[in-house]
Amino acid sequence: MSSEYQIGHEGEFTYRGHTLDELQEMELDEVAELLPARQRRTIKRGLSVEQEKLLDEAREAGEEETANNPIRTHLRDMPILPRFVGLTFAVYNGQSFERVEVEPEMIGHYLGEFQLTRTSVEHGQAGIGATRSSKFVPLK
């Protein structure tokens, strides 16, 4: 199976045979045809009001500099579109807003995939009384 995106022989990014500039000039329906099935279905069924607002914010922010002022959103289920490349989003992970800088390789994924909601637990050493056998261990 070939990958969805490639770096061409000139070092130019392509997504399913289209350069980034070509992708950014396409309409939303044309881009949807290139996306994976789940993301394509999301767009074909119609974006929600909140997702439409996020698209408008991204369109406005594309003309401005957003490095210092990321676009804040709770929409973890928003597919990453070519017009988002280069923008910075602050995606809510259930506790705080974390920065996600969109790169060309992220096209076709969801915003939430790049901001995890759970952290892995790193347990320390067991203490006194943690197990039945440790109740009678003498203290140092």
Swiss-Prot record:
<dbReference type="InterPro" id="IPR023575">
    <property type="entry name" value="Ribosomal_uS19_SF"/>
</dbReference>
<dbReference type="GO" id="GO:0019843">
    <property type="term" value="F:rRNA binding"/>
</dbReference>
<dbReference type="InterPro" id="IPR020934">
    <property type="entry name" value="Ribosomal_uS19_CS"/>
</dbReference>
<keyword id="KW-0699">rRNA-binding</keyword>
<dbReference type="GO" id="GO:0000028">
    <property type="term" value="P:ribosomal small subunit assembly"/>
</dbReference>
<dbReference type="GO" id="GO:0003735">
    <property type="term" value="F:structural constituent of ribosome"/>
</dbReference>
<keyword id="KW-0689">Ribosomal protein</keyword>
<dbReference type="InterPro" id="IPR002222">
    <property type="entry name" value="Ribosomal_uS19"/>
</dbReference>
<dbReference type="GO" id="GO:0006412">
    <property type="term" value="P:translation"/>
</dbReference>
<protein>
    <recommendedName>
        <fullName>Small ribosomal subunit protein uS19</fullName>
    </recommendedName>
</protein>
<dbReference type="Pfam" id="PF00203">
    <property type="entry name" value="Ribosomal_S19"/>
</dbReference>
<comment type="function">
    <text>Protein S19 forms a complex with S13 that binds strongly to the 16S ribosomal RNA.</text>
</comment>
<dbReference type="InterPro" id="IPR005713">
    <property type="entry name" value="Ribosomal_uS19_euk/arc"/>
</dbReference>
<comment type="similarity">
    <text>Belongs to the universal ribosomal protein uS19 family.</text>
</comment>
<keyword id="KW-0694">RNA-binding</keyword>
<dbReference type="GO" id="GO:0022627">
    <property type="term" value="C:cytosolic small ribosomal subunit"/>
</dbReference>
<keyword id="KW-0687">Ribonucleoprotein</keyword>
